[in-house]
Amino acid sequence: MGKKDASTTRTPVDQYRKQIGRQDYKKNKPVLKATRLKAEAKKAAIGIKEVILVTIAILVLLFAFYAFFFLNLTKTDIYEDSNN
């Protein structure tokens, strides 16, 4: 008798989940497939944040490379010009 009484009472959350399951079951295959593909595409998409971070990292490396060679390959020395 305890099992029969326990199975009839459900929490509101369980009732809600069962209702959603019924609604989801009623959808046809193309709608379910489109929803799944949309969710996968959203998960796999590269965000603008990552693109900006990679671009900034590349620019910083190029600037450091340029500054290194600019400072090492200049013909005049700053200290010699100020002493004369």
Curated annotation (Swiss-Prot):
Membrane topology summary: Single-pass membrane protein
Locations listed in the record: Endoplasmic reticulum membrane
Family: Belongs to the TRIQK family.
Function, as annotated: Plays a role in cell growth and maintenance of cell morphology.
UniProt KW keywords: Endoplasmic reticulum, Membrane, Transmembrane, Transmembrane helix
Gene Ontology CC entries for this record: endoplasmic reticulum membrane
The species this protein was found in: Xenopus laevis
Transmembrane spans: 51-71
Domain comment in the entry: Both the conserved triple repeat of the QXXK/R motif and the hydrophobic region are essential for its activity. The hydrophobic region contributes to the endoplasmic reticulum membrane localization.
PANTHER family per record: TRIPLE QXXK/R MOTIF-CONTAINING PROTEIN, TRIPLE QXXK_R MOTIF-CONTAINING PROTEIN
Protein name from the UniProt record: Triple QxxK/R motif-containing protein
